[in-house]
């Protein structure tokens, strides 16, 4: 017998809306069980999705999706949404090759009107859709669901300020799962929320505003303040949103459908706006291990449902994130000017390790990358040595601050760029594909990439020693190569690479962790009679010009390999060769970069193979440069 008999009857939200209201809770219960079962098989973001099961069910029951546009901020909580919107039969393909995305994706379903994975974009996108609807004379609803973490970012407030000024008929649902804004909610709060979301209250309030326009200013201002005070006293938490021009409704229990459904129905039928509905939920709701340790179940690998034990593979190599955190701790023990900064990703970047050792010198600024960079710049002006640890994909959000506030002033901010290159299951939205290109064009910037975890230790020490300009150190997600680790980091000579293996026919110049693939390719090429040099550039800027020219002069073929897009390391090498006349027929130069597409999720190994950046692809590129076909030449040499 099925564990989800009612959910089995639902293919789309239209099927859900045919059910009686007293059946909706059973759907939510079954939806939660299906979400738990699916994620236990695939892994993925977990706690946030469990927290919005009732909210997801209620929204699709009340609103006419996809005609009514539903936007999930970040999108990592959208697994229940995907199950209800025609994708249940593929839910166990989440984050695998050819399977469902771990986030909302426009090309995946009409029920995903806006793709997401980075935070705080939903209200801006929703306002754009609402304005487009009004311009076209439509009457559909637009709903943006945003978390209490995401709403802390400046972009969300910019959008709310704009929406309030326009009196747009937009619905924003604040999913507060940290209890960070409001106290626990109760029956009186639910009653008042229902009252304030209703048509009678809104009509009276609008009438009061119109009357106020004809009263003397002093009296009108006092009346408005009294009204705001009374709402704040009774409701709590809404004054800020009211000041931005929103009707504030809440806080309400996001797991109580008896509260959620009537309020959503009232707001759905409203002719004015915008609304902010404050819903309080619990991360991991309905699964005891996740409720007890929400941080450990934010994102999970495959796990045992009965115990909650996650099936993490053992490794002999440390993760790059841990190596960075531990290296920074060692450096900070010798230098009290070192501080660590993260934008809401302490465990993802290794800053949590630093925080345990130096809590007073650790700053988590929240989802505020722009602020993080300029905050670091301010610290640098006062002689401190800020390490701003941030994912490559999120540093994009603070590019003007990097340019204007850091590079232009040559301030020694140290950027520790995590998740450089392809990241696997999180796919294109989280790939660190572009930082080589967008940082490499900036004056005053030192840019280096670790080829393994031991090099990372030395590069952290190198950044500590750079006090006259900004520096960027990039390294990938995941585990290192298992190399021998140094006891302490030793600063490297700026702008100097190293030769790993000497040959005379082919030169492979790597920037980053593709070095291991270069070494594999060199072995295969040597077996085929092609003597191959392997070099580790270490620095993209300043580039080791002497090394580049030496490789070009002493080899027939020079190939660069990097985990980044066009416009990065290979482009800089080509520019150098062109300036020295080395591309005038003297050397066959090829730059291996990520393809000019957004690569979908898969394992990192498969993604790099598909991108043409593994050892096999390197060997193939060498034969292409020679003007020979690899398979035929292999047979000939054999």
Curated annotation (Swiss-Prot):
Coiled-coil boundaries: none
EC number: 2.2.1.7
Keywords recorded for this protein, A-Z: Isoprene biosynthesis, Magnesium, Metal-binding, Thiamine biosynthesis, Thiamine pyrophosphate, Transferase
Pathway listed: Metabolic intermediate biosynthesis; 1-deoxy-D-xylulose 5-phosphate biosynthesis; 1-deoxy-D-xylulose 5-phosphate from D-glyceraldehyde 3-phosphate and pyruvate: step 1/1
Single GO term (MF): magnesium ion binding
One GO term of the biological process aspect: 1-deoxy-D-xylulose 5-phosphate biosynthetic process
Binding site for thiamine diphosphate: 76, 117-119, 149-150, 177, 287, 369
Reactions this protein catalyses: D-glyceraldehyde 3-phosphate + pyruvate + H(+) = 1-deoxy-D-xylulose 5-phosphate + CO2
Co-factor requirement: Mg(2+); thiamine diphosphate
Binding site for Mg(2+): 148, 177
Pfam family, one: Transket_pyr
Note describing how the cofactor binds: Binds 1 Mg(2+) ion per subunit.
InterPro entries noted in UniProt: Dxylulose-5-P_synthase (IPR005477), THDP-binding (IPR029061), Transketo_C/PFOR_II (IPR009014), Transketolase-like_Pyr-bd (IPR005475), Transketolase_BS (IPR020826), Transketolase_C (IPR033248), Transketolase_CS (IPR049557)
Entries under PANTHER family matching the protein: 1-D-DEOXYXYLULOSE 5-PHOSPHATE SYNTHASE-RELATED, 1-DEOXY-D-XYLULOSE-5-PHOSPHATE SYNTHASE, CHLOROPLASTIC
Assembly with partners or alone: Homodimer.
Family membership noted in the UniProt record: Belongs to the transketolase family. DXPS subfamily.
Function text: Catalyzes the acyloin condensation reaction between C atoms 2 and 3 of pyruvate and glyceraldehyde 3-phosphate to yield 1-deoxy-D-xylulose-5-phosphate (DXP).
Protein name: 1-deoxy-D-xylulose-5-phosphate synthase
Source lineage: Bacteria, Pseudomonadati, Pseudomonadota, Alphaproteobacteria, Hyphomicrobiales
